Amino acid sequence: GSAATERKIYVGKGIKYFSNIGVAEFLVEAAEVSVGDKLLITGPTTGAVFATLDEARVELKPVETVKKGEHFSMKLDKIRPSDKLYKLVSTEELKKFKGLE
């Protein structure tokens, strides 16, 4: 196994970036995300951007958790459509999700 203490879990992809307000929109395609989650956004131009989800908005309303199939927006430095969104989960937490190891 890997000695890393964190694993990345695919969440979804970038849809749009609103540069005038510094907000990124993502579509959740796989794992849900919740406020407080540590995130990693990657892409060919973007590189790797680490962030913590301080506030997620679905249809402009703040939510605690964003579920699969939902679009959400968050304050973020520039990202690009098609960037991939992951959440970083400690290997300890991962053990709670059976079948991922």
Give, region by region, the residue ranges found by the protein language model.
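Beta-strand/loop-dominated core regions that host nucleotide or nucleotide-derived cofactor-binding catalytic loops
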Residues: 3-101
